[in-house]
Regions:
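Class I S-adenosyl-L-methionine-dependent methyltransferase catalytic core
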Residues: 1-196
């Protein structure tokens, strides 16, 4: 697995052996960040199911200002910390070794706000649980990108999130959302996504 583009583009990322952690494929990461374009520049990123850090590291490589990575699996956590260190990203990266909800609560208490959330939870985790607590750390207008198995049901509407676009890449689907819409906008959001 390599970083696709940016300041550390082409560099190899460590990944734990086995099938527990599945880093986002390079072509999917490329498509995700191509869609976001300049929206990544200078932003704060939260990666609450970081695994080896492929998504958040790609964001940092493409100009994100800072990233918080959250991971609990020991092998993935070791790979994540080594990736951040090997790529010289320590000054802009923070790694929290705790469950996602606990980390989000901690960040909310600290007053942290993020303009980009990269959500790639274990496929078995229910969506309501995967997004639980996320709104507490999102800045108004934040992008939320959710990766899931394309065969699974699409994420249900979540208060404050307005769907923008979905895109399928083989067995993976990405859903792009914007945060900070009022309830009326959110309720009317069904016809807003442009599916490509």
């Amino acid at each position: 697995v390599r970083v696709v583009a940016g300041s550390v583009g082409g560099r190899t990322l460590r990944s734990p052996a086995g099938t527990t952690t599945r880093p986002t494929e390079e072509r999917v990461r490329a498509a995700l960040f191509d869609r976001l374009g300049d929206a990544v520049a200078g932003v704060g990123v939260i990666d609450p199911y970081a695994g080896s850090g492929a998504l958040g590291i790609e964001a940092l490589s493409r100009g994100a200002g800072r990233a918080v990575f959250v991971e609990v699996a020991p092998a993935a956590l070791r790979a994540l910390r080594r990736n951040v260190g090997d790529l010289g990203l320590e000054a802009r990266a923070r790694v929290l070794a705790e469950p996602a909800r606990r980390a989000l609560d901690r960040l909310a208490r600290e007053g942290a706000r993020f303009e980009l959330a990269l959500i790639d939870p274990p496929y078995a985790l229910p969506w309501s649980q995967a997004l639980d607590g996320l709104a507490c750390v999102l800045a108004p207008g934040a992008w939320v990108v959710v990766e899931r198995a394309a065969r699974d049901p699409a994420p249900a509407h979540s208060p404050g999130l307005r769907p923008w676009r979905r895109a399928r890449y083989g067995e993976v689907e990405l859903s792009f959302w914007r945060y900070g819409q009022d309830e009326e906008d959110a309720a009317d959001a069904g016809d807003l996504p442009r599916y490509v």
